[in-house]
């Protein structure tokens, strides 16, 4: 549902809910670390089917909450199959994303836009550096 054609290989990985939260927390810390020298920039992970809340001013480990898949809470110990296009493990290679997208588009007679899954931001009202 949501992708960027910037990294070539697609992957499918098994991850626990706790692992997913840890990854989102780490990416969030790259953006919102209170020490500007540790802010690495970038953007939050684009996710399909997953919704969550993000509180940028909270401490590392407490920024991500209310993670849900298709409206149901994510279980910390439950394992989920996660598809991606930017492998996080060394030596992982899958089919190039542009081939996956091409196959998917060809299999449909009509493609309609879907609602983007954007994180719900908490505590950013009045912050001119964060666009909501």
Q: Each predicted region: which residue ranges?
A:
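Feature captures C-terminal
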Residues: 1-132
């Amino acid at each position: 549902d949501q992708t960027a054609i910037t990294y070539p290989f697609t992957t499918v990985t098994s991850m626990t809910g706790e692992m997913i939260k840890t990854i989102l927390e780490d990416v969030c810390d790259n953006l919102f670390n209170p020490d500007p020298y540790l802010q690495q920039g970038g953007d939050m992970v684009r996710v399909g089917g997953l919704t969550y809340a993000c509180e940028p001013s909270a401490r590392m480990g407490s920024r991500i909450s209310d993670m849900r898949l298709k409206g149901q809470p994510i279980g910390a110990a439950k394992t989920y199959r996660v598809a991606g296009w930017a492998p996080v493990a060394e030596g992982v290679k899958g089919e190039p994303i542009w081939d996956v997208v091409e196959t998917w588009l060809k299999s449909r007679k009509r493609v309609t836009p879907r609602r983007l899954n954007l994180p719900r931001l908490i505590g950013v009202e009045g912050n001119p550096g964060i666009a909501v």
